[in-house]
Amino acid sequence: MWTLPLLIIVTTIVLSFPFGRYLAWIMDGRYKAPGWLRWIEERLDTGPQDWKQYVIALLLFNTMAFIIGFAILQAQALLPLNPDNRGTLSPTTVFNTVTSFMTNTNLQHYSGDQHLSHFSQIGFILWNMFTSAAVGFCVLAAIIRGLRSDSHMGNFYKDMWRVVVYAFIPVSLVMGVLLMADGQPMTFEGQAQVTTLEEGAMGTAPDGKPNPQMIVRGPVAAIMPIKHLGTNGGGFFGANSAHPYENPTAWSNFLTCLNILIFPLSLIVMFGVMLKNMRHAMVIYSVMTLMFLAMAVWSIYWDTLHPNPGLTAHGKQTYNVSDPTAPGGKRTIESPMVAGLPVDQELGNLEGKELRFGTSAGATFAAITTAVTCGSVNCMHDSLNPLAGITPMTGMWLNCVYGGKGVGMVNMLVYLIVGVFLAGLMVGRTPEYLGKKVEAREMKLAMLALLIHPIMILGPTGLFAALDWGRGATNNPGSHGFSEILYEFSSASANNGSGFEGLGDTYGYYDNQAPAPFSPHWDIATGLVMLISRYIPIITPIALAASLAAKKMTPFTAGTMRTDNVTFGFVLLGTVLLVGALLFLPAAVLGPVAEHLGPLPFGG
């Protein structure tokens, strides 16, 4: 039970140190690229950029990505590589999907194996998985240059080239081969028609003949490596990494977890190497690892070591819940639907789990995928025991426990600035970070970056929980329904992309005659949250780093607060927990905590 999480974290930690040094070597331009690659890189180099030029280049690149992505999805039915004749998604779903993949969120209000063609998967999804992940990486590199007082922030286009070509593509190729060898398909063929062993298992046609089974396939192995290396998370299949074609065996599950964690951990090492301050980086590394281990242990304890009370503890009970689409505005449900069955739960809560990965793999994966804002899932998060469901939410609320590709480290730097400021106030000294004074401008930028995240989660959650837009979309009553709404906006704001998936938020094709009634509301609301929560928290830290870069170094004295010792580690940990986590405590109490303590095992 504990072997898998320990093996994953130990292996990743060991690999992160040499790989982090390699990434620093790349981003500092100390490598010797082959001639033709160097020629392309030189063409992309438009010269050194200050922070405003860097941000403008970043926004222009993302604007072009949005336009191209929107065009591809709108024209999907007319484009090649569409053997299964996929149609055109609704306009709001296209907006949500393009925004989602452009911002590295990969929130999916559609099912990849049912709604997208191979061309869309390769030309839109795969492309954005590389570039959106690289954007966060580039932002971190630019901030590091500002913190070490370089004369410029670098060049965005040159940084993008370095990240994609020298970091992502080589590792993706190696991982792709390993995953294909383990059973992931790689083909541009359409669905395979097979005859089932049990005649009529797929139903019968009007003429009485048994229906064949249609198995979706495609270029899965091309997408899966960068899906996890880039902490993207969007699945080729609707079941995501629980699907046997995305995640065939326990070995592929281990590789997947390694892929998710390796870059976020290595970027902390890169931070220390580029700043020439490994002691400070190790304090950050240790704090993040401590928080991650706490999340993983909590998740496993409350899910794998505790049975699902909804299966055995209570008999069936009938409830009337609000549903604007039902006659009279109410619908009747039995909750829990399978209560009272003689189910053996010695292995813990097995609802929504794939046992081919091992008993603790679902809870472990849930902690990993939300700690680093990946969003890929190998179990149904909606089926986690209530207190175990707090783990993925906490990872998204903090958004810095390793965090996404570069952006997690950027978020931790914001907490660092706030922590230094609070510590300086407590001892009566002007706060300093890396020898630079932290003053009013830096604190305003830090607080803007910090507060936009809870605002974008709690505000829309309260709005949708109060309106039919939210209540009419949940498939569960009470606290669990509230948790579904809270999780969706937490995922959108954290650029995570996973979901409790009990929401009716899928419209489907534009000509769908029976879409989820409030799906356009969810498409637009989460799309706007993703945009705001992506760009404000990465632009303001760039401005903050540029502000610090313009200041003179102050000499180190006996009264200077050190940022490379255990004491500062506790200051940083306290800042993250007090400033970050406590903001969401009331929402957690209304959702998963109330569900755990309530009269019903689920959805009381």
What are these regions (language model features)?
Residues F19-R30, A71-D84, L147-D150, L178-A192, ...:
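Juxtamembrane/interface segments at transmembrane-helix termini
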Residues T3-L6, T46-M64, N155-L173, L275-F292, ...:
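Alpha-helical transmembrane segments and their helix-start/interface "positive-inside/aromatic belt" motifs
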Residues H152, M270-R279, L425-E439, A543-D564:
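Alpha-helical transmembrane segments
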Residues P80-I125, P185-L258, A313-V407, R471-V529, ...:
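P-loop potassium selectivity filter motif centered on the GYG triad
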